[in-house]
């Protein structure tokens, strides 16, 4: 009854907040009606139909070019937003029944000064570039980007309208291009097949279009249709491509079978060969939706995670690097309840609870085996976005061994598991939207179930100056009895103009838990957040542009309803005309009553107030040698605890193809205080005063053999140690009392050393050959090393190596059909 009463009180608290937000919104509407609305005429360009395909050779000599009217008069995005571009650009558009053709003349008064660096695919590096964004539905919600550098390096991006615009560089398409540098500048020709786009057969209307050109030596970014930098997002600030009509969407069907082989070795065991094979399939169900299926996937060649020593009560977050889960997954990010790294991650259960007398764990799998994954996603011409993602992993077993008899047996640490995510999203007027999403995890032969349902919305006014946004979610998880929790958030913001600001309130109950298929650091909290932001985008004095913000958070626990902390901070970012950048950020945290550091429900530790600041400086990245410096400092004024941290990064380009990067990071915390241990009954909680030192070295090298082949090497060593000096017992009032009876050694010395070397060759459109070498060594002990080189030698004692070759071949149904017809 007490919990229900507490929950009802929180609902009333949120209701009062909503009522306040409504009154604020009425005030905003009054302000809006008193102001002149921003209006901008969209540019248009006509696409001409052609009967003979253009030859993609970087020469604009076909007769069709004399008949077409080019798109021109580009304007600056940076540094002088809205003023004419420093160099003229003309772009021509054509189409036939299979593709859109783009021909562009990028004039340059100094062709020998064009930044013509060659890089790997999907990376412009520091090269000049030209690109087009095509929005077939002309709704300002989704656009397909095709970019090219003077060296012919292709970059394809899918931009999605969200809170701002998210550019998905993991999206890949198969298209043709050719560039050529002349005495007048450089020339681009593209052939973008309709199979790379999603559009409606019925709609003979204008498509959304914008073009971008970057001239590196001027640090100048330009667009065809004006993109007002005082307005959040760029997709809805597009022009129009007219004239495309009577086009039937092609069959979108492709297969990408792969074969791979691995030679793997670990110290103390024999090297073994592994062979894998599988298939990726993409099928356009209709004009709007695409099926993407992966059978028996192989992720053995992705870059190693940057592992770290984690002394916090929160799970470390690692970004997704598997292409299937990064490409075309923008819909599934609605609601914030999907974290794709859960799929195929480490087993959910441990074999410890299944051990019998005299048994030990002989082997435990580090990850579950994913056997297939399927996603269906798309958006209709009426603005309905629908996505379904499903994945399955096999049962995972640990091996336990009887130390007396030597007998071994398997213990299930995760049954056959099904993961499912479903989302429905509706685009509304003024680039607004509302979404509903559900995630579900079920295990066959196990009663455990986890289910989360969430909604998210953002409503903008006509001028897109103000917005109301919100989220809500309910989680239910368990086996025989289910634990249910709730999440709610509501905010109002002004996100247009030099001055922007916002306020929001969220509430997360103590039983809300989306982490079976999502990621949430902590629940059981209520946060009121307010912020104000100001930007100057026009150059003045020695400054090219600058911006700054001030923010404040008031955090309380949900249960019990007590203060957690109050934080106030700010940020200043300045870019100078010489392309140097300076950043300062800092915050002040009042006394914190931390209920998470203790690892025991209902217990808290009182952190003394502290402040922190960071200084960052980077030099001109256009130069062959560019540098980055960082210094950070944190201090508790009433105690002897403080922290110093620093970073140094250097990037060196040698010629047009070779680049070196070096990063050195160091962090030293003196007399830090944190959790160490607790007894079985959780009545005794041990903290320690400790010194924590961390050091990281990262060396990266990339060499472009051509615009279709590259070699990349990345080596990283991370070393972190925690030396406990004084042990304490946590008291009921959150204070500490020195404990002279605690004798266990809880020091930590952690090392992670990884090497990733990869040769990638795109030997045919959509096809690739990848050769990879991966080396990994990890060491975790309770004896703190003081000498760097002896510590590194000890780390290398337990290494694993993997040498692999993978061939993936792209087969397009339309190409096969065309060859058969011919």
Model-assigned labels for residue ranges:
Residues 40-425, 436, 797:
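Structural preference for beta-rich elements and adjacent junctions enriched in aromatics
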């Amino acid at each position: 009854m007490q919990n229900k009463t507490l929950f009802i009180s929180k609902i009333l608290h949120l209701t009062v907040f909503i009522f306040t937000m409504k009154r604020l919104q009425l005030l905003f509407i009054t302000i809006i009606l008193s102001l002149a609305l921003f209006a901008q005429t969209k540019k248009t360009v006509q696409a001409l139909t052609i009967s003979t395909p253009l030859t993609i050779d970087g020469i604009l000599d076909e007769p069709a070019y004399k008949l077409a009217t080019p798109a021109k008069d580009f304007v600056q995005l940076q540094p002088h937003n809205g003023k004419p571009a420093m160099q003229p650009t003309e772009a021509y558009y054509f189409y036939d029944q299979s593709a859109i053709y783009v021909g562009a003349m990028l004039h340059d008064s100094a062709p020998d000064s064009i930044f013509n660096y060659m890089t790997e695919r999907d990376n412009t590096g520091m090269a000049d570039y030209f690109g087009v964004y095509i929005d077939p539905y002309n709704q300002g919600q989704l656009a397909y980007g095709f970019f090219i550098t003077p060296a012919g390096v292709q970059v394809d991006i899918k931009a999605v309208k969200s809170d701002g615009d998210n550019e998905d560089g993991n999206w890949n398409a198969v298209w043709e291009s050719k560039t050529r540098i002349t005495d007048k500048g450089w020339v681009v020709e593209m052939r973008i097949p309709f199979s790379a786009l999603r559009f409606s057969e019925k709609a003979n209307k204008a498509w959304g279009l914008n073009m971008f050109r970057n001239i590196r030596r001027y640090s100048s970014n330009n667009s065809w249709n004006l993109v007002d930098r005082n307005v959040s997002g760029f997709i809805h600030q597009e022009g129009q491509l007219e004239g495309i009509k009577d086009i039937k969407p092609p069959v979108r069907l492709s297969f990408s079978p792969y074969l791979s082989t691995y030679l793997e070795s670990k110290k103390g065991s024999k090297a073994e060969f592994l062979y894998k094979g599988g298939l990726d399939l993409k099928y356009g169900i209709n004009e709007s939706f695409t099926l993407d299926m992966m059978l028996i996937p192989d992720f053995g060649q992705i870059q190693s995670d940057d592992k770290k020593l984690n002394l916090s009560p929160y799970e470390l977050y690692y970004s997704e690097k598997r292409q299937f889960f990064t490409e075309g997954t923008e819909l599934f990010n609605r609601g914030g309840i999907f974290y794709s790294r859960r799929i195929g991650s480490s087993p959910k259960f441990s074999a410890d609870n299944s051990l019998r007398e005299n048994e030990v764990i002989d082997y435990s799998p580090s990850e579950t085996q994913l056997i297939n994954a399927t996603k269906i996603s798309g958006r209709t011409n009426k603005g309905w976005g629908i996505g379904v993602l499903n994945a399955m992993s096999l049962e995972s077993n640990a091996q336990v061994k009887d130390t007396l008899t030597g007998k071994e047996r398997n213990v299930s640490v995760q049954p056959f598991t099904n993961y499912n995510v479903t989302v429905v999203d509706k685009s509304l007027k003024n680039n607004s939207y509302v979404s509903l999403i559900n995630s579900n995890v079920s295990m066959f032969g196990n009663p455990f179930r986890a289910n989360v349902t969430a909604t998210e919305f953002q409503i903008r006014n006509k001028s897109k100056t103000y917005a109301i946004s919100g989220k809500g979610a309910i989680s239910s998880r368990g086996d025989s009895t289910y634990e249910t929790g709730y999440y709610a958030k509501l905010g109002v913001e002004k996100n247009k103009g030099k001055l922007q600001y916002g306020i929001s309130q969220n509430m997360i109950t103590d039983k809300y838990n989306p982490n079976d298929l999502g990621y949430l650091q902590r629940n059981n909290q209520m946060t009121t957040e307010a912020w104000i932001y100001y930007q100057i985008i026009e150059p003045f004095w020695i400054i090219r542009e600058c911006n700054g913000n001030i923010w404040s958070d008031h955090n309380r626990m949900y249960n019990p309803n007590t203060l957690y902390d109050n934080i106030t901070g700010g940020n200043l970012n300045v870019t100078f005309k010489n392309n140097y950048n300076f950043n300062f950020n800092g915050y002040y945290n009042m006394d914190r009553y931390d209920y998470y550091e203790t690892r025991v429900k209902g217990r808290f530790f009182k952190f003394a107030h502290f402040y922190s600041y960071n200084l960052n400086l980077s030099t001109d990245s256009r130069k062959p040698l560019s540098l980055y410096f960082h210094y950070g400092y944190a201090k508790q004024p009433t105690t002897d605890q403080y922290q110093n941290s620093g970073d140094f990064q250097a990037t060196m380009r040698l010629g047009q193809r070779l680049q070196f990067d070096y990063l050195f990071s160091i962090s030293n915390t003196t007399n830090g205080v944190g959790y160490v241990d607790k007894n079985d009954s959780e009545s005794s909680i041990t903290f320690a005063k400790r010194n924590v030192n961390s050091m990281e070295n990262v060396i990266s090298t990339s060499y472009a053999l051509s615009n279709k082949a590259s070699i990349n090497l990345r080596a990283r060593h991370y070393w972190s140690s925690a030396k406990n000096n004084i042990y304490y017992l946590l008291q009921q009032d959150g204070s500490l009392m020195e404990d002279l009876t605690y004798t266990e050694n809880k020091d930590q010395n952690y090392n992670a050393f990884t090497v990733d070397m990869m040769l990638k060759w795109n030997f045919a459109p959509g096809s690739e050959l990848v050769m990879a070498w991966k080396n990994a060594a990890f060491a975790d002990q309770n004896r703190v090393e003081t000498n760097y080189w002896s510590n590194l030698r000890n780390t290398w004692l337990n290494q694993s190596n993997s040498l692999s070759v993978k061939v993936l071949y792209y087969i397009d149904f339309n190409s096969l059909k065309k060859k058969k017809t011919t």
